């Protein structure tokens, strides 16, 4: 932004980015906890329900590859509008799905849209938020996203009661994405609100905003970048994949657990929504811990807590108070996840080469998303072969090993308190 532009404030991006993000995440928050429930209602086994829930993460992983080129070609705001429209199509497909396979395709498409929306909003912030405000804006964006993930399930409770089924709650995704589209379409041009931005021109190409250029660089030559940085990605990137895997396993296992215990659809949404409130409440604390004490004091306790929460689930499924233990485990997992808020983005920023960070950050994000995509498939496979308790126990063991791995690797690559 140029010096002649109007004075910037964080509130100026509230309607442009924060409100569409809140609406999109409310829709996702309403839908995600009920995917396994909807799948089993359509006749899927517990294992297949896990696969269908995991299609969201698989879609995000696949969407990582073309999303940068798409955002660079059509722009940040148009990409967010397109992603929200595609999400509406996916949500309608989920509502009307006659069988588990159609539901799985709809959830996969939603994952593709989520990848594009996430990159587009990040690119928008890069283009229009001055550097000195960017960390606060991105931190607030993360908090807004987490707020939606706990508001969504709570909104779905009365909708489930009114419609009589889990798929009825998917209408929340449709309505919230439609509202996001209307906001993005009706807003004036961003450069009218924030002033002119410096545009990047390369030979034979049109002008790009800095965010569009960042998006293109992140996805260009992804596999070449993975090979170039194979050393640090094998050591630290594997840690990112483990964190992604633990988070995805939590997202899939909690609803699966509720189904296996016979918890009602409305109560499932309520429990996961309240757990999301705990997660949301800790996102600022995580940033303070990372800045004051070092990245290791966020990454290791978070991963360890996720592992211990999974082990608690594994050993309490068949106890007389299994539902009480389920609620306790959901709370522990949410505290652990909240303590790790922003850790993957922060570690990626710390490790990225300062001169040209975008390609590395694209490879870093892909590595974390690969772990997220793999975890639900592992959970589904173990559930199908053995039981959901064995699946939780295996993921819990991975969490313990992941915490040990991060405790060894982070001090080797990142100072105890970066910037001090």
What are these language model-derived features?
Residues 8-57, 235-239, 247-261:
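Helix-loop boundary and gating motifs at the non-cytosolic
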Residues 28, 109-121, 332-344:
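Core transmembrane helices of Major Facilitator Superfamily
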Residues 63-75, 282-295:
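Helix-to-loop junctions at the C-terminal end of transmembrane segments
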Residues 79-92, 297-312:
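Structural signature of the two symmetry-related core transmembrane helices
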Residues 2-11, 191-236:
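Juxtamembrane intracellular "pre-TM" segments in multi-pass secondary transporters
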Residues 169-185, 392-408:
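Symmetry-related core transmembrane helices of the 12-TM Major Facilitator Superfamily/SLC fold
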Residues 43, 75, 96-101, 294, ...:
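Helix-breaking motifs and short loop linkers at transmembrane-helix boundaries and internal kinks
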Residues 108-145:
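Cytoplasmic helix-loop-helix junction between adjacent transmembrane helices
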């Amino acid at each position: 932004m140029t010096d002649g532009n109007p004075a910037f404030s964080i509130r100026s991006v509230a309607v442009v980015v924060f409100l569409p993000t809140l609406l999109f995440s409310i829709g996702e928050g309403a839908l995600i906890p009920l995917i396994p429930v909807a799948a089993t209602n359509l006749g899927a086994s517990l294992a297949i329900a896990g696969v269908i829930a995991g299609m969201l993460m698989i879609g995000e992983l696949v969407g990582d590859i073309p999303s940068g080129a798409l955002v660079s070609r059509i722009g940040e705001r148009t990409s967010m509008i397109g992603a929200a429209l595609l999400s509406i199509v996916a949500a309608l497909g989920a509502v009307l799905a006659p069988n588990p396979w159609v539901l799985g395709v709809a959830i996969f498409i939603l994952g593709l849209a989520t990848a594009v929306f996430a990159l587009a909003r990040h690119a928008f912030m890069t283009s229009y938020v001055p550097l000195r405000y960017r960390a606060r804006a991105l931190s607030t964006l993360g908090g807004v996203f987490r707020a939606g993930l706990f508001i969504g399930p709570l909104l779905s409770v009365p909708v489930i009661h009114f419609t009589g089924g889990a798929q009825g709650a998917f209408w929340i995704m449709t309505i919230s994405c439609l509202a996001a589209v209307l906001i993005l379409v009706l807003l004036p041009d961003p450069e009218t609100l924030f002033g002119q931005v410096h545009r990047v021109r390369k030979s034979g190409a049109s002008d790009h905003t800095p965010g569009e250029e960042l998006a293109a660089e992140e996805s260009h030559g992804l596999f070449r970048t993975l090979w170039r940085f194979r050393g640090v990605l094998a050591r630290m990137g594997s840690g990112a994949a483990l964190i992604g895997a633990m988070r995805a396993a939590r997202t899939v296992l909690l609803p699966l657990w509720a189904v296996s215990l016979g918890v009602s659809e409305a109560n499932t949404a309520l429990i996961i929504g309240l757990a999301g409130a705990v997660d949301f409440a800790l996102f600022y604390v995580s940033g303070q811990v990372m800045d004051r004490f070092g990245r290791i004091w966020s990454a290791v306790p978070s991963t360890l807590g996720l592992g211990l929460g999974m082990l608690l689930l594994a050993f309490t499924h068949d106890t007389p108070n299994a539902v009480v233990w389920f609620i306790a485990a959901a709370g522990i997992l949410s505290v652990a996840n909240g303590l790790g808020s922003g850790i993957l983005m922060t570690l990626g920023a710390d490790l990225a080469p300062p001169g040209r960070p975008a390609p590395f950050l694209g490879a870093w994000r892909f590595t974390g998303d690969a772990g997220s995509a793999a975890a639900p498939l592992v959970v589904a496979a173990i559930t199908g072969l053995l039981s959901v308790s064995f699946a939780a126990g295996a993921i819990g063991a991975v969490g313990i090993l992941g915490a040990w791995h991060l405790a060894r690797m982070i001090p080797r690559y990142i100072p105890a308190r970066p910037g001090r």
